[in-house]
Amino acid sequence: MQTPGLDLASVGLPEVWAGCDAWTVFDTDFLDGQRFLSLWRAWQHDSLRPRLLHYVAIASVAPCMATHGAGHHADHHRGDAQELATQLLDRGIGFHRILLSNAQVSLTLCIGDVQTMAGEHVFQADTLLCSAPANKWAAQALARRCKRGTRFWMDTAPISGADAVAIGHLSDWAQAAGFQSDHIPPHAQALCGTFNPRWDIPTSRTPSAHVVPSPGRCAIVGAGIAGASVAHALALRGWQVTVFDQEAHPSGGASGLPAGLAVPHTSADDNPRSRLSRSGSRLLMQHAERLLVRGQDWEPSGVLEKRAEGGALWHRQACWITPAALVQAWLTHPGITFIGNTKVAAIQRADGVWTLRDPQGRDLGGYAVVVLANAMGCAKLLKGFEVGVQIQPDLQDKIAALQAIHGTLSHGTYAEALAGLPETPVNGNGCFIPRVPGAAGTQWFAGSTFEPEIRAASDLGAQHMANMERLNHLLPLEAFDLGETLSRGQVSQWSATRCVTHDRLPLVGPIETTSGSGLWLCAGMGARGLSFSALCAELLVARLGAEPLPVEFSLSGSLDANRVRRKRVDTQPD
């Protein structure tokens, strides 16, 4: 199936992507999504397709669900259109990462002004699909997203035939920017050709030293939600990943939370934490939909946020989830090997290969890339390097400032039927998940405490009472004291330690900024690991593989491990 106006053969597809690990398409006008659907289907039906298809598209306004109605498509393609329509719901201004075809097709939809959105990218496309640039500066902006050899298709339908002079100007602008057009027949509806400038391309487009051009062997230290999400993202890209953890099983730390909420943070100014958690929560829900069982491991229930100043906000795109189930699902990818009961005590680098060793000095293997995703453990491991590693003082400062914040979650089963309970989870100052299926019946969860002192955290009785007091303020019921009533049933407490950064945002990126040593960090998920982990993984692998970023370049800096530290010393949950 071809989209009206676009013949995939005019840009060499699908033949040119045969045998490639990945292929990146940049489309400056998403319109009704038909170009994307056409290319997605071509990828599905091609036995020589690349492992990953990245499609980056700009839409000036949020695409309308009705545009993608199933009735517009043949029966065997309706499922694709319906899946896309579902994923396009509730998309606002900004970047949106949408994973399709078992996460092997990545659609990055950028909603907003074309020039602004295009300026937030740093990748180079293999294929460019665009509207005719309005002037030479627009043509130059498109050129910045190309590499030598990029095939392009420029839609000239709006001006073709009506203004031959405009077509001539367009051809001149394109050629001056480095786009070499094929033969242009009279009344052509598009310009096609290759980006092949006569001059040397600026070195600013040269991939960073941190980029690894092809998949290899990677070791990840830590099998919690941070490490598992990175492992899965790398395995999808063909990496052979080994995940080490000192516990016998994955999710041995804070990721073993019995149930938690993936819900966006909100702020009056829609600050980076709010934007990143909104993107990350939506991305995590895509993984859950693909890998977990609804009603058992997770539920896209939505979450009602009670505001401290009064009123409430309904988060439609939010869920409750059992993190350990997702961690286990991520780690079941055939490209991942989990090794438990193994503490990584030292990392050495020689001849471009990292060697990991346990406390007894035993060799745990050699790897091109190592990702430290072991929360507070990363600080101690980084101090033990036996080779010179150039860590910037600012990153050293941020690692030294990591806080171990202890938290306790109360949970149990109902001793009696309770009227007036909410149907969906509620959060605010604390949270309450009213209905999660369990072996002993329907479970409830309330919490969690946020204790910087281990002595206070060790008094589980006091921690439970604090949870119940917070719950009574979150959900004041006239008929009965909710905390006291819940405590009549079978109640347990679950405790763990969170790794919290100075500004409550994770640290993601290469540990060394001056060389591509292959040592990366993904830590500091804090109290919002469910909202950040999947996004952090996408960001890390995008930077490692020179892929399109999952969020705006300017926003991604808020997660960069080497970002400038902003001072913050409070110990309150966000």
What is the role of each PLM region?
Residues 317, 481-574:
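C-terminal catalytic lobe of FAD-dependent flavoproteins
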Residues 220-221, 244, 365-377, 537:
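Short hydrophobic core segments
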Residues 200-219, 225-237, 246, 251-266, ...:
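Active-site substrate-recognition segment that forms the wall
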Residues 153-155, 271-280, 313-332, 458-463, ...:
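Short beta-strand to alpha-helix junction loop
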Residues 259-318:
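Dinucleotide-binding Rossmann-like beta1-alpha1 core, especially the glycine-rich loop
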Residues 340-355:
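A conserved short coil-to-beta-strand element within the FAD-binding core of flavoproteins
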Residues 69-120:
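S-adenosyl-L-methionine
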Residues 215, 360-369:
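Core beta-strand elements of the Rossmann-like FAD/NAD(P) dinucleotide-binding domain
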